Regions:
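Juxtamembrane loop-helix boundary motifs flanking transmembrane segments in multi-pass membrane proteins
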Residues: 46, 50-53, 87-91
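Non-cytosolic membrane-interface motifs at loop->transmembrane helix junctions
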Residues: 49-56, 122-133
Length: 202
């Protein structure tokens, strides 16, 4: 995530010339670098055999890029809701839209690659694992935002609230399921369970 945040910022700046995204992505990347330095144990996870696959790297990379873009869209949404009391400009909403388009596209690629990986590992493309369920809810939420923007382009604040709700769903999809009791021992995506299972196997 520390690598893909500034990369997302550079790509966004190169495409739409939003200068602020460079500073935002760099600062947020430094936050994650500090986490990696001072809490290295969070990465000390042993993957179960099914997850030790060539699909692991591209699947995670695509998702991290998607999360970086959608995170940037969320920061912009928060800024517009809290600091733009006199009206939101069309080009400001266009920024949120463009970031969401790219983020959702990469999220879709992540879901598709995950489905292919699941088929190879477990024999099915989709099993409504808790992680998959939250991923589907997140995907549909961002899709609903896009359709809402197309249908009601002037309803800026309602759209931005929807963007914040979508990001909350994304947080549950990303790491929130690790703490859901219903996911423990059930979800192959639950890192806490995966790590414990690997320890028991050793």
């Amino acid at each position: 995530y520390s690598f893909f945040l500034p990369l997302a910022g550079i790509i966004t700046y190169g495409r739409w010339k939003y200068k602020w995204i460079l500073g935002f992505s760099t600062i947020l990347s430094l936050v994650f670098v500090c986490i990696n330095i001072f809490k290295p144990e969070i990465h000390n996870k042993t993957l179960m055999p099914a997850l030790q696959s060539p699909w692991f790297t591209p699947h995670v990379i695509v998702y991290m890029f998607a999360y970086a873009m959608l995170g940037a869209a969320t920061v912009m949404a928060v800024y517009l809701l809290w600091f733009k009391k006199k009206g939101i400009e069309r080009h400001e909403m266009a920024l949120c839209d463009n970031l969401t388009y790219v983020g959702l596209a990469f999220m879709t690629l992540g879901m598709l690659s995950g489905a292919v990986w699941a088929k190879a590992a477990w024999g099915h493309y989709w099993a409504w694992d808790p992680k998959e369920t939250w991923a589907a809810a997140t995907w549909f939420s961002y899709l609903a935002y896009i359709h809402f923007r197309l249908g009601r382009p002037a309803a800026h604040r309602k759209a931005l609230v929807g963007l914040l709700v979508s990001f909350l769903l994304l947080q549950m999809c990303w790491y929130g399921i690790n703490y859901l009791p219903s996911a423990q021992g059930v979800s192959v995506h639950c890192l806490l369970y995966t790590s414990d299972a690997a320890d028991e196997a050793r």
